[in-house]
Amino acid sequence: MSDSPFRNVALIAHVDHGKTTLVDAMLFATGVFSAHQERVDRVLDSNDQERERGITILAKAASVEWRGTRINLVDTPGHADFGGEVERALALVDGVLLLIDAAEGPMPQTRYVLSKALARHLPAVVVINKVDRDDARIEAVVDEVYELFFDLDAKDEHIEFPIVSTIARKGRAMTGVGIPGDDTDLSALLDTVVDTIPSPSGDPSGSLQALVTNLDASDYLGRLAIGRVVEGTLRSGNQVALCRSDGTTSTRRLTQLMGFEGLGRVDVSDRVAGDLFVVAGFPEIEIGDTLADAIDPRPLPRLTVDEPVLKMTFGVNTSPLAGTEGRFVTSRQIRDRLEREVLGNVSIRIGETSSPEIIEVAGRGELQLAVLIESMRREGFEFQVSRPEVIVKDVEGVRHEPVELAIIDVPDDHVGTVTQAVAPRKGTIVALEPGETGRTIVTVKAPSRSLIGLRSLLMTATRGTALVHQQHSGWAPWAGELPHRQGGAMVADRAGISTGYALDNLQKRGTLFIGSGEQVYGGMVIGENSRTEDMPCNPAKPKQLTNIRTHAADEAIQLRPPRTMTLELALEWIGSDELVEVTPTAVRVRKRTLTSRAAVS
């Protein structure tokens, strides 16, 4: 093994298998958190939605020192929707830590990222975590890991991986299969990483080539570029060439160079081949650009990511409530925010439409687009979006659409729920794998457009116990029309404040999306009709006052709880003539045309 003073390693794990707990323990074991400091749980999951959704969205890095070797840890998203982040994370590293739960075994998210790592010929250290669980089945899980590598056509050298057993929450590890004792720490894991993961290749004395894989921003330094030095040495104060995507090259002096230390960044004088860097002072730099030798610039191959399969429109909010709940409401502000997203997210694309106030946004999947919308909403943006549509293409004159594999992990008693959910969506069950933990993995192949909303549906039907992983599986001839919702829309025909009296009458006609005392406007969808046609209604209708006392039953209005329209549910529910209004405080469904007569056409 090379005596290089650092290792670059990516972390691959499924939801709740202990990835962030393990990183916390490694930071503590190597002194990043001192004994008197309060530790911050889930340090790498710094994005609010990552903590809430239990997924990793952004690829982040931390660095620890272990016995003279710096280990750069790069987190990887586990979902195919964030494939752009996965590719960029793996471009930074020379090996992976594959973290597996000792009871649950390999899971869908694990398979996707591991397949990408094996395609890059990255060696793995397999970590079996939570080996102290009462339901741990360590030997069986190890066998399942080997089966996973075989299924992914791993080469012999990749299958000969070391195994480390850990109890991350207690900071214990041992090599091989077993349960670490009370006298152990994480030394076995850290030593295995240093001994197994190859040191970075590249000659520090060679011609400079450094690949930009991510972007960040600083209030003081402006745009920051994050990446890896592939060849040569990046030195602060030297002239470097910036090689752009359009083939142009510009030269300037590197004034601000940083490296990773613990959870932060520190100023450094240089970064040698194989190390990770952060640079400032290049306001036009983009992901995939190369920082090269000023005299002999040689650009590196640009990063490639999977093509978008879904598109939708983002536009200025045109409802009567526009501007009352958000801070950023103009088309210029929305466009600037989306352009910033594209700069830092290579798997998102934006395009023009026939209206300057409406922008088309394409992404890898429904989850990725929903995360973008939710991020903007929390930042104070107010806008309206259309239903996601698949991107189609012609193959030899035949219309083709994207097809996905949905790998659904559910308790055994909910397998029937899955089959009932996918049957009307033209999905085909291609595999059914009962596990030893009372759960079954159902693999479904279906058109991408038919899977919109499936995650929310299954989460509701299984009371939050379903795990759904979707990944692109190619293209297939157009599958024809798919069934949408059966009921029409209940559409408010005027503005006002909803009343219990009006809603009591309307709830007999369908399912309500609003409660009493809410602001409504003409063209706003306030519920789903039990019949197929749209129904105009007045949810603000007051009860006529008389001097005649009514029966007590008339006084006691019992409203059923309204259906809460989350962002994902709303995106699935709406049709082509409807939009979702998104503000920092509300998610509303509305008709595209708000005049009462046209809105209910």
Regions found by a protein language model. Name each.
Residues R39-L44, L152-V164, P200-L211, D246-F260, ...:
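Interdomain boundary/hinge elements
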Residues M1-I100, E104, A140, E144, ...:
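P-loop NTPase switch module centered on the Walker A-proximal segment
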Residues S4-A10, V15-G18, A80, A103-S115, ...:
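Conserved structured catalytic cores and adjacent interaction surfaces
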Residues A586-S601:
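Acidic, low-complexity intrinsically disordered tails
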Residues Q209-M312, A322-T324, G487, R494-T546, ...:
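Conserved nucleotide-binding/hydrolysis modules and their immediate coupling elements
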Residues D16, L22, G54, L73-D75, ...:
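Residue-level signature of catalytic and energy-coupling elements of molecular machines
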Residues P123, R133-D195:
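Canonical P-loop GTPase G-domain recognition
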Residues S319-V342, R560-P562:
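A short, contiguous, amphipathic alpha-helix enriched in charged residues
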